């Protein structure tokens, strides 16, 4: 979402970003429209004390940048990023427009899980102070917004907003020809045996004996996930462990017929998730296959989209019909782009400042 924001608004406003260095091998995102400060490499294998010290230094570095540049507005993503914004808003720049966005929805109970101490501490700063002084607090869809406002009744409708994570207009494919000799499926994103149906889906692929090809692009996965897939020895499954750069996804999707979602949806966050991959598949003209446990997609009016959106009951072994039927999809009615979302966001801020 940050990349789409920069690409959409970089020519209209001065943007500065403070973030950690990523731990994967993909080239870091860059954009001349924004100054991006990357400090301290993300490393989940280090001790909790090391992570805490690194977090404090990162927060102080970010606070220094805020004091130095005196922004008109501050936007942070997720509770884990709240601390430097809290310090700046409370003690330095009290007039700054504070904006908060949640790409993920977390219940109050989830902040108490093992390994969430930093997020829980930051969330206490949000509930005790930041929510009371924020100009904007957003979730990605109406369902999550309603859940969030039920958790945080101190937030008003005027402050709590919706900021979907749609892909940019440059990804748009007005027409999509499905004419592959076999059905080609693609999955992009994180994987685990615990939280996704990737193994069950791969087992089904293996049984199709070449009717379906499945390519996986993921750099964020558990070793046992890769081991389980490789153990199938299926020639129609290819696992690309290097993942794919975000900017290269549109051209990659041109090769495929179907984008697959595989979440088991064990949490409210995933049950009511319009995952960004859903719209990235649709904007490219791909059909979408998803598990029935994804409640929001199950309840959605899918007829407004031209590609076929098909529900799977994976636990019962019910998968889509893979009979090949070449066709052309007229995707011209698709109208959900990041540019419109962030333009509305900026108009809101301008009104607040005016």
What function would you assign to each model-found segment?
Residues 7, 60-67, 83, 87-91, ...:
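Membrane-proximal helix-turn-helix segments that form the acceptor-binding/catalytic region
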Residues 138, 167-171, 176-196, 202, ...:
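Conserved donor-binding/catalytic core segment of Leloir-type glycosyltransferases
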Residues 225-258:
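Nucleotide-activated donor-binding/catalytic signature segment of Leloir-type glycosyltransferases, i.e.
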Residues 7-54, 144, 219-225:
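N-terminal strand-loop element at the rim of the active site
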Residues 76-81, 103:
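Short His-centered aromatic/hydrophobic patch
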Residues 115, 120, 127-160, 167-169, ...:
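A short, active-site helix/loop in glycosyltransferases that binds the activated sugar's phosphate group
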